[in-house]
Structure formats: structure tokens, C-alpha cells
Design a protein with these regions (language model features):
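NAD(P)H-binding glycine-rich loop region in Rossmannoid oxidoreductase-like domains
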Residues: 1-31
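Conserved Rossmann-fold NAD(P)-dependent oxidoreductase catalytic core, especially the SDR/UDP-sugar
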Residues: 6, 10-12, 30, 37-79
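Structural signature of the Rossmann-like NAD(P)-dependent dehydrogenase/reductase core
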Residues: 12, 49-54, 58, 103-109, ...
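Conserved catalytic-core motifs of eukaryotic protein kinase domains, centered on the activation segment
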Residues: 19-27, 61-66, 116-117
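Short-chain dehydrogenase/reductase
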Residues: 27-29, 66, 72, 77-88, ...
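Conserved catalytic Lys-bearing alpha helix of Rossmann-like short-chain dehydrogenase/reductases
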Residues: 33-39, 83-91
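NAD(P)-dependent short-chain dehydrogenase/reductase
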Residues: 92-147, 153-158, 162
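C-terminal substrate-binding subdomain of Rossmann-fold SDR/epimerase-dehydratase oxidoreductases
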Residues: 141-143, 148-255
């Protein structure tokens, strides 16, 4: 495909998400790392650039929780996180050893109004909007006070394009940049949605696997390196995202 269509940049998005990967660790490893190695080898042979997303899952319980630095201890305790750290190191290796133009960002939880949740620890932040728009009580799988970074999908797509178009001479870091747009816990998200859907109700029923994963991740990220090195600047905050999510889902669901 790369040869036939003269591809210059490969976006490798294959992964089994965090909670699902814990149920089948080897599948998580094989999908996450197997796909990356294939892409890196193709890029080495044909001279392509490669973008592979990392994640806040690349951090672990010993990582500083608040304003997590760009360069810090990682040591994740999930197979998803292990694949992400491995991916960061492999990508850097292919850059330094073979000159492959590898770049990456550590995505927070991504919130989409198009794609349904798929087994991630942060997926509650998508599911909650569906419940609110449908007029259903939301059962939250995480405890009150569980803060995590999040980002609306339009900003995530911008980040994927912008980093690959950035001037390489300005990139001190490559694999992988902290990026974020907002940080909240379920209660803050619930109260934000209630401003627009006052009858919305939520009940807490934490799921042990998801809660343990969330507890090992940062509360907030320092993304100053991304802002300084390639101009990262998200457009959506929590309120702006919530308005757009609710409007889009109402149209999508006919509510």
C-alpha cells in the first residue's frame, strides 16, 4: 500500500484499550506492539514518517499525580500502559538508529460524539452524555474525586495533524508529548451536564478494575513542552465540549 500510493506518513492507531486489555493481556500486547513494529519497519524501508499515539496510561502509580511533567518516572502497571511505554521507546529508537521521523502525543481520555465507547477507563466521560441525552440515570464506574485529563475529539485530531506538520528542528521531544485540554472528576462532569439537562441523575457504582487503573494515572498533565515546541493549543474546554456533545447527540439520537 505504501509503495502503490506513495504514502509519506503512517498513522498507527491500532490498540486494545486499557480495561479490555486487562482481560486479555497478550492480545493487548500483540495488537499494540505488533502493529507498531510493522509500521516502523515499513517506514524504515520506504522513508515514511510515523505517528503512534501514546496515552496517560503510560504513567503509573509512582508518577507525580498533579501537573505530571513531560519527563518523569512512568512504570505503568497495566498491559496497556506497558505497550505505550514500549511504543515510545521503540519510536525513539527508530528515530535515533534509523532516522525514521517518529512523533507521538500522550493522549488523555478522548471524548467523541461519533464513536461509541470501546473498553477504555475514561469511556465513562462519553457514556455519561448518552445517558443524559436519553433521559436515563447514569451509573458511574468511577468514584467521586477520580480526576483524569480529557480532550474532545476535534482537538485530538488537530493534535495528530499539527505535530506531524511541526518544524522538526524545534522538536526537543518526539515520543511522546503530554497534551491535555481539561481535567475533571465524575462529579464536576455531572454538574456541568446538569446545567444543560437539569433532570439528569447519576449514581456511583465503582468497577474495581477501572477504578484501580484510574487511580494509577495522573490527575493532571503539564503540556507546556507541546505548547512551546509545536504550538499545541486546544479549542474546547468542558463547557464548550458539553454544549457540542449534547447538541450533536440530540440530533443523532432524535431526542
Amino acid at each position: 500500500v505504501v509503495r502503490k500510493y506513495n504514502i509519506d506518513t503512517i498513522y498507527n492507531l491500532a490498540a486494545i484499550l486499557s480495561a479490555t486489555a486487562e482481560l486479555n493481556p497478550m492480545l493487548g500486547w500483540n495488537v499494540g506492539i505488533g502493529s507498531l513494529v510493522n509500521c516502523l519497519e515499513v517506514a524504515r524501508v520506504f522513508g515514511c514518517a510515523v505517528f503512534t499515539p501514546s496515552s496517560i496510561g503510560a504513567f503509573g502509580p509512582n508518577t507525580p499525580k498533579d501537573m505530571t511533567p513531560q519527563d518523569t518516572i512512568q512504570r505503568p502497571n497495566t498491559i496497556y500502559g506497558v505497550t505505550k511505554v514500549t511504543g515510545e521507546l521503540l519510536s525513539d529508537y527508530y528515530f535515533t538508529r534509523f532516522g525514521v521521523d517518529t512523533r507521538s502525543v500522550r493522549f488523555p481520555g478522548l471524548i467523541s460524539n461519533l464513536t461509541l465507547p470501546g473498553g477504555g477507563t475514561t469511556d465513562y466521560a462519553v457514556e455519561i452524555y448518552y445517558s443524559a441525552v436519553k433521559g436515563e440515570k447514569f451509573i458511574c464506574p468511577l468514584e467521586k474525586g477520580t480526576f483524569m485529563d480529557m480532550m474532545y475529539m476535534p482537538d485530538a485530531l488537530d493534535a495528530m495533524v499539527d505535530i506531524m506538520e511541526a518544524d522538526p528542528s524545534k522538536l526537543i521531544h518526539r515520543n511522546s508529548f503530554n497534551v491535555t485540554a481539561m481535567s475533571f472528576d465524575p462529579e464536576i462532569l455531572y454538574n456541568t451536564i446538569k446545567k444543560y439537562i437539569p433532570t439528569f441523575e447519576m449514581e456511583y457504582k465503582p468497577e474495581p478494575i477501572k477504578q484501580a487503573i484510574a487511580n494509577s494515572w495522573p490527575n493532571s498533565l503539564d503540556d507546556s513542552c507541546a505548547r512551546n515546541e509545536w504550538g499545541w493549543n486546544p479549542k474546547y474546554d468542558l463547557d464548550k465540549m458539553s454544549v457540542d456533545m449534547i447538541e450533536t447527540l440530540r440530533a443523532k439520537l432524535g431526542k
